[in-house]
């Protein structure tokens, strides 16, 4: 396959994504999910940082993970059902098709989480909320975690973006997992819900140790340096994603 065909495949997926309402609805959905996760009207402790951290900790954040998977996670079953995959394979090959789709599922989920967070933060600022209230809240806990240098320099917006990026790495993995389930389950609601159920089971079974899904929270810092911690978290997200890609490839190969 030449580079022109590869570019056409990526351009086709990008156009398909941007022209679809799902990604825009998902971004808004993530913002709303964070807000309603706090289960109260207004900002926690009167500030945006506490509201965002608490909102991303409570059970409502799981709805945000569903929104992250919503735009693209069911692409494999959709392409197989409407035979669009055969058109794709004329211009490409199966391996390239699977790699491209998984990349879009994974990166779209991260993008939705980050942009949804940014929308939430901007909404809080427009509503007149302060970034922090140093007399109360979770600042002391956050200062012991990753990216504390951003908090010390009062770069609160950038801190929340980095926090959401780490959550995005988890949402990317969960979205690819949903894509894998979509090859076995035709009910799209169930497909989007299953990774969240697995996520909840992991939380219930693993306890409070950081070396589970909690490692994606930026208030935990598994390594001494921020870049080391981020690299570890990136590997924890990408390696299972690659393994799922291999399973997806084999499953589609059998169905063609």
What do these predicted regions represent?
Residues 21-23, 94-95, 99, 187-192:
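Membrane-helix interface segments
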Residues 33-75, 103-183, 218-237:
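Secretory targeting signals
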Residues 75-108:
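Helix-loop-helix units of permease transmembrane domains in multi-pass membrane transporters
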Residues 128-142, 196-211:
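Juxtamembrane non-transmembrane "cap" segments at the membrane-aqueous interface
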Residues 1-26:
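Aromatic- and glycine-rich beta-strand/loop motifs that create alpha-glucan
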